[in-house]
Amino acid sequence: MSSSASLSSSASLQRVVVLVGPTATGKSVLAVRLAQRFNAEVVNADSMQVYRGMDIGTAKLPPAERDGVAHHVLDVWPVTKTASVAEYQHLARAAIEEIGRRGRLPILVGGSGLYVRAAVDRLEFPGTDPAIRARLEAELAAHGPEALHARLARLDPQAAERILPTNGRRIVRALEVLQLGRPRFAAELPEYASVYDALFLGLDLATPELDDRVERRVAAMWQAGFVDEVRHLAEDCGLREGRTASRALGYRQVLTMLDGGCDEAEARRRTVDATKRFVRRQRSWFRPDPRIHWLDAADAALETAAARTIEGWMTSRS
């Protein structure tokens, strides 16, 4: 199918390709290649690539490596802003629909499971209570995320399984929802039902190979000047005050190093270990989704396999 393939269809729903999978599987590069084939544009679904200046540590593709493909919902928030999935949902859907109005195909790309679902699925967000939130955040500051995660595990094991014990922001949010008297946080995630006509593609590969990729990625981050990036964000952009960005993989560990909590070798080791744990969490999030067509990220013909799947999907809707 040529890049000028028509996106017209008898269906009224906007079409979107969703490309997901664990960190270090090559999603960003594949998305660019597919976008060139299918007259498409990329919409980011990585929760940390929305932050300006967080480039090396998030493996954000530099503009020169995007090969002229438009990317959306990148670099939209300062590192001091606390993440809002509801706000991200608004930005992502606006981008998807604007791309579609111009007759192009949106490709949503990322490994942040909740952001992916917020962008394309029937997902609504409970309200907030500033008093409850403030009390929980004070407990977080006093006792650390692991203590609150243990409480969440007692109250809602499903939610605790989906949230990293170090992710204080999401733990606080889950506990807040419970205290508001809403149904259990995990139970509020609806069945898999998209608001768009969506094709889901997933990339993964064998654990030993993925672990090796993670180690090589972290080594490349350090070689590319990651410590200097974190230092600049901390000294000039307020990274330490950012409740979300300061806890990102790698950034948290380097901030600890800069504050004298460990040496550089230990910060690097902790980054590798934390990233490998995160990969396991990503898999546990994406694997139950029956809509995902899984592809081998190590396949030399990966681009061809993905393109054929997209072509078949588009043909079935012509």
From Swiss-Prot:
Disulfide bonds: none annotated. It comes from the Bacteria. Keywords: ATP-binding, Magnesium, Nucleotide-binding, Transferase, tRNA processing. The record marks 112, 133 as: Interaction with substrate tRNA. It is an enzyme of class 2 (transferase). PANTHER family: TRNA DIMETHYLALLYLTRANSFERASE. This is tRNA dimethylallyltransferase. It comes from Acidothermus cellulolyticus (strain ATCC 43068 / DSM 8971 / 11B).
